[in-house]
Curated annotation (Swiss-Prot):
Gene3D superfamilies reported in the protein's UniProt record: RimP-like superfamily, N-terminal
Keyword Iron (UniProt): no
Family: Belongs to the RimP family.
Transmembrane intervals: none
Superkingdom: Bacteria
SUPFAM superfamilies, alphabetized: YhbC-like, N-terminal domain
Keywords for this protein: Cytoplasm, Ribosome biogenesis
Subcellular location(s) of the protein: Cytoplasm
Protein name: Ribosome maturation factor RimP
Length: 143
């Protein structure tokens, strides 16, 4: 499939719905092949985000997208998952207070995102609390 829909267009179409429900848009992937497409959306709202909420969101988002998109498409909505790889600085802010596995050198260290800032975040382990620059992070994932 070839990616042709602008992700920011999808973002703008669904942002109002997610904002009203206090839900963060983590990631959007859009693909189109001939007259069919696929839209994948990853959403997050702390611990109180169940299957019923996802089902309701799917219906609301589908209606918003069907008005604009003039071809058949499938819509997949999911949550980040237990071991999601953190892909951007913005996600550190979204996942504040969550446990992560962090690789700075060659080993993973487990700890908590205590506070995310503009250029880094405070990482708390059982033994220390340190400030880490996003540019120093080799890998990070939820744990």
């Amino acid at each position: 499939m070839v990616k042709i829909i602008d992700n920011s267009e999808v973002y703008n179409l669904i942002k109002n719905v997610t904002d009203q429900l206090g839900i963060e848009i983590i990631e959007i992937n859009t693909f189109k092949k001939r007259d069919e497409g696929r839209i994948q959306i990853v959403l997050y709202k702390g611990n109180d985000f169940g299957v019923d909420t996802l089902c309701d969101l799917h219906k609301m988002i589908l209606l918003s997208l069907e008005v604009v998109l003039k071809y058949n498409f499938s819509l997949e909505i999911s949550t980040p998952g237990i071991n999601r790889k953190i892909k951007s600085d913005r996600e550190f802010k979204i996942f504040e207070g969550r446990k992560i596995k962090l690789m700075l050198d060659n080993d993973f260290e487990e700890g908590l995102i205590l506070k995310a800032e503009a250029d880094g975040f405070i990482f708390k382990t059982d033994t220390k609390e340190i400030r880490i620059l996003y540019s120093d992070v080799k890998k990070a994932k939820l744990s």
